[in-house]
Amino acid sequence: DFDPEEIKRKVSVCTAVAPFAWGSTKINLIDTPGLFDFAGEAAQGVRAAESLLIAVSGKSGVDVGTEKAYKMAKDLSKATLFFVSKLDVEHSDFYKVFEELKSTFGPSVCPIVVPYVEDQQVKCYINLIDMKAYTYDDKGEAHEVDMPDFGHRLDGLTAAVSEAVAETDESLFEKYFSGAGN
C-alpha cells in the first residue's frame, strides 16, 4: 500500500497491479481491497484475475470479507488459495484458522506450506509437497533447514493434502482410499 489513505488506514482501498517475472513467465499481482467497504474495487480485480489469493488473518480468522471473497471467486470459477497472514502477531494461530477454513469452505482446503511454531514464534516453514523445512532471511531468500520434530501433526497435515486431492477427482479419490495415495 503506497497511497497516503492506504498508509493511514493500513489497508488497500484501491486496486493496484504489481508485475514481476518468474522464470520466463510474467505474473501480474492484482492487489484489491479486503474491506468490503471497497467491494467494487475488489470485484474489478477479481474479474481480471485468473486465480485468487485470499489473505486471512492468523489472529481473527475467517470473517465476512473472507466468505464474500470466496463466494465471488467461486461465482466466477476462479482457482483460489488462502494465505494465513499476521503469524507474527500475538495470539495468532495458523492451525486454528486452517481448521476454520476447512469447516467453512470444505475438505478441498488443504495446507501446502505450514509454519512450525515454538513458544509462539515461527521457527521455520514446512513445504508439505517436498517435505522440506525452510527459513527465510531478511532478503526473502529461502534456506533449507533440518526438518523439525512435528510429531503426529505432520501425519494429519499430509493426510489433509491427500484427501483434498482425492476430493477433486474420482480416480484420485479411488486411488487414495485404496491406499495407493498414502
Regions found by a protein language model. Name each.
Residues 1-43, 47-56, 60-62, 111, ...:
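P-loop NTPase switch module centered on the Walker A-proximal segment
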